[in-house]
Amino acid sequence: MDAVEIHDAGGPYAAKGFFYRDMKMDSLVPSDIVAWDESGISDKVLDSFEKTVQYCKKNNIELVCVTSPITPTTSVNGYSEQAGAYFTRLCEEYGVEYYDFNLLTMDTLPRTDDDFFDEEGHMLGELADRYSDILASVLLDKCDKSTAFYGTYAQLEQAVYENYVTK
């Protein structure tokens, strides 16, 4: 099956759980963004993460954790910084590499809220293709990570402000 059209999916099913969304909406599909609360992470989830880390280390499998980008506006107005800090600490504690792709510079991955289907970060197909290329280059160590990512959310917020508010 090459593609299946699913009503309300925003585009055809391409494969492996990927809908190639190309539908431009008048506005983002609203989402119920939940406040970040690290106390809401269950012991069961942490136990599963620890078992995954142990399995990968025992079997010489490189485990890399990532947070994929969400809309620029939501990433600076929501809880991304708190979540990113939590996952950074968690991954450092277990010796696992972690990348917060919300912090990709706007030069590395130009994006606006219009490149997304909803506030949760479901990308339209064109952005998903560009992000996949960048993700691969980071994982394959084929890019300069020191210039591909902002160092802080304050730098991201400044770039979002410069790109959206002042233009």
Mark where each language-model region is:
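Secreted/periplasmic serine-hydrolase-like ester/acetyl group-modifying domain
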Residues: 1-59, 147-167
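Short amphipathic alpha-helical segments, especially helix-boundary/capping motifs
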Residues: 25-29, 61-64, 108-112
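Active-site segments of SGNH/GDSL-like serine hydrolases
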Residues: 52-77
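C-terminal regions of proteins
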Residues: 77-167
